[in-house]
Amino acid sequence: MWQPGGMGERAAAAYLAVAAADVTLAATGRRGLRRLTKPLLMPTLLIGRDRLTQRALALGGVGDVALLGSSPAAFTAGLGAFLAGHLAWIQALRTRQGSGLLRRHPALALPYLAAWAGLNAYLWPRTGRDRYPVLAYSTALAAMALTALDTGKPATAAGGVLFLTTDSLLALDRFARVELPRHEGWVMATYVAAQGLLAA
């Protein structure tokens, strides 16, 4: 969330500009230029935010840089950074007013749990030695999305759903070779929207 006195509109405009550039480069396969745009995403978004939100975004920024690489070590580093980021988001989201939606309407969690179970069942035989790290990561991701839903704020809940979408697209591509046309563009479009909505 914005802190009082934050840069507000200018920071939001800067993030939108960097995000639009990176999504365009991702969709057109210009990986080299993305070494300039992708590392700027989270540092731009965290300007003027509260401390807990900044921590979650900073961990996302570490993951962004790690995943510019293509080695197994880069993937592991990115996975670890984003897992820590999801845990940080859970802490940040719990401080927001209006939480408690799931206590009143627990059935709202069912689609999230079904998506988590279905994706893991599909990926389990395909992830090899990564299956336990992927399971741990997906559990943290689902918990973060449910925490976002529990705030009772539609935009925040949408951010959680979009993050689920982002990482589902990534997992299906990496482990099952399932991808959309301009796949990386869709991944980044959902990702930058997710982080922006969670941070708003």
Task: Annotate each predicted stretch with a short phrase.
Residues 1-200:
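Short amphipathic, positively biased membrane-proximal segments
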